[in-house]
């Protein structure tokens, strides 16, 4: 019998060995320094593709001067009491070093590249930034020039054989180092021992790295993220570390605050909270020269996800076409939303948190339940959603008001009641007949104040689930089509879309109101105006969507770039 067990163990060992041979880990990659159990991480495990990198480089070259203007303004505000303070001098010296670097080639002259791998992650709760350098000597030379211009050298120390730069105060110690071809920046409690410093700097590697575990690669595969910027915040791990990570108490002592104390009940309560929303993950799903899409998922406990899905239908009307100036829809089922939150507050009331640190949370839920657990009168109780579509927006020179056309849809289980209220409030509407057939009817003269109405075409229409208003020429037909369209699929909390032309409008409005803006703000706003004007040439379309599914809430944002 023992012989067969040994033979089975040998076969298992061989299989594991072969599996290990098939999975080669790059020990020089930033992910090889990230602990597999890190509570948070965002990393690009592969460099950007050439086409994407070139697109970003073109945009950066134009935007860089305006970004510098904003930074200069912020620094002027921070240092207005003492612009030559010891703290401000190195910051200004660093800014001078990068001021003219508006192309990838110029950044490479100081050792930084656009096609490198990097990671931001936690060793415990302590943050670490790790970036590949393209030229270590050039980076060191840049730091030397910054020191010379600032008139002071950075404080240095040795951790083992590793040279580090240090900075900070009596509570926080910043560490900066060049390790092989990596630039590493981190922070620890000022009283941290050498063992902790070695861990955060990666001089002592984690027992298992994220590269070896493959967890980030698996996340990318499961969620459809690209390897150019993805990661997570692990809520369960983060809350557990508030109790277990000694750095929390060390920072508190450094700042002269009492060390937080967590009784045994806190661990169970933190786990209970984390079980409801265990993780937020995020990453690019598209990233090329034509389009960029970013997705985030807040994972939820199945019971909460299902309860949230039950109240999530869809905003009224279909999303507008890609030719709209702006389209925004949101689900607003007030009664169902109230019931959802009353249910959540009731769960806390039934089983209050026992952790002393969470006592305010018990009080908050109790107060919320008391305020929410009341009758909601119509028309508020009838609301189900809202959609605003602006088809056209312009503000011609010399015009007193903008030229706007579009439609508004208000979802309601009783839209006729809204019409009745409007007729009671506005005498001009009393004789208007509006059926539930979705056919637009022109609003009578006198409905709107003369200064607002002008020569506007204003129509209203209604179906059994929504009331709509159209403003502008040809918008009545659009309103009728929106009300006649089939109901959209459920599960949508919010959808939004807008044209890159919105930045042209922002730029024009800043210019239009320049005379009434305080003089000290005009220079900064002028830079912002120019930047908006450039945005209008870069971006063709923005789309955003928030949906609820069985696994949680998804946030999706996409950008279509304008053709150069």
Predicted regions mapped to residue ranges:
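Membrane-proximal interfacial segments on either side of biological membranes
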Residues: 244, 334-340, 417-420, 502-513
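Structural boundary/hinge residues at secondary-structure and domain interfaces
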Residues: 21-166, 215-279, 293-397, 426-429, ...
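Bacterial N-terminal signal peptides that target proteins for export
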Residues: 1-10
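Bacterial N-terminal signal peptides
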Residues: 9-17
């Amino acid at each position: 019998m023992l012989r067969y067990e040994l033979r089975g163990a040998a076969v298992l060992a061989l299989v594991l060995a072969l599996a290990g041979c098939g999975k080669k880990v790059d020990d020089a990659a930033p992910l090889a320094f990230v602990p597999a159990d890190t509570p948070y991480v965002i990393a690009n495990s592969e460099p950007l593709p050439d086409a994407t990198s070139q697109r970003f480089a073109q945009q950066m070259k134009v935007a860089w001067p305006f970004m510098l203007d904003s930074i200069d303004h912020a620094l002027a505000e921070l240092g207005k009491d003492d612009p030559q303070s010891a703290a401000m001098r190195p910051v200004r010296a660093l800014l001078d070093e990068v001021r003219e670097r508006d192309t990838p080639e110029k950044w490479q002259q100081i050792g930084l590249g656009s096609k490198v791998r990097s990671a931001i992650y936690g060793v415990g709760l302590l943050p670490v930034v790790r970036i590949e350098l393209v030229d270590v000597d050039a980076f060191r030379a840049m730091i030397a020039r910054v020191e010379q211009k600032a008139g002071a050298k950075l404080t240095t120390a040795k951790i083992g054989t590793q040279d580090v730069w240090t900075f900070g105060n009596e509570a926080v110690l910043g560490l900066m180092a060049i390790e092989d071809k990596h630039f590493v920046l981190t922070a620890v409690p000022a009283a941290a021992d050498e063992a902790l410093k070695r861990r955060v700097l990666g001089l002592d590697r984690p027992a298992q790295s994220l590269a070896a575990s493959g967890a980030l690669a698996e996340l990318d595969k499961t969620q459809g993220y690209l390897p150019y910027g993805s990661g997570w915040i692990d809520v369960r791990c983060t809350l557990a570390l508030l109790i277990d990570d000694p750095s929390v108490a060390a920072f508190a002592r450094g700042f002269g605050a009492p060390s937080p104390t967590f009784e045994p009940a806190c661990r169970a309560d933190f786990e209970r909270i984390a079980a409801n929303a265990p993780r937020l993950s995020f990453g690019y799903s598209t990233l090329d020269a034509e389009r960029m899409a970013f997705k985030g998922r807040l994972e939820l406990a199945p019971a909460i996800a299902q309860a949230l899905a039950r109240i999530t239908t869809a905003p009224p009307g279909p999303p507008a076409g890609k030719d709209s100036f702006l389209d925004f829809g949101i689900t607003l089922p007030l009664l169902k939303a109230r019931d959802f939150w009353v249910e959540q507050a009731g769960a806390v009331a039934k089983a209050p948190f026992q952790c002393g640190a969470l006592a305010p949370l018990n009080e908050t839920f109790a107060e919320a339940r008391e305020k929410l657990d009341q009758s909601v009168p119509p028309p508020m109780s009838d609301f189900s959603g809202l959609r605003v579509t602006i088809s056209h927006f312009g503000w011609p020179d010399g015009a007193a008001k903008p030229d706007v056309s579009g439609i508004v849809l208000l979802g309601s289980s009783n839209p006729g009641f809204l019409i009745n209220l409007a007729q009671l409030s506005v005498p001009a509407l009393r004789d208007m007949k509006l059926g539930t057939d979705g056919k637009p009817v022109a609003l009578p003269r006198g409905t709107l104040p003369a200064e607002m109405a002008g020569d506007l075409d204003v129509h209203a229409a209604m179906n059994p689930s929504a009331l709509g208003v159209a403003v502008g020429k040809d918008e009545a037909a659009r309103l009728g089509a929106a009300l006649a369209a089939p109901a959209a699929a459920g599960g949508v909390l919010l959808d939004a879309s807008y044209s890159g032309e919105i930045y042209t409008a922002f730029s024009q409005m800043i210019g239009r109101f320049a005379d009434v803006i305080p003089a000290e703000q005009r220079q900064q706003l002028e830079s912002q105006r120019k930047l908006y004007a450039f945005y209008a040439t870069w971006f063709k379309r923005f789309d955003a969507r928030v949906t609820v599914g069985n696994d949680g809430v998804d946030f999706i944002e996409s950008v279509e770039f304008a053709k150069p």
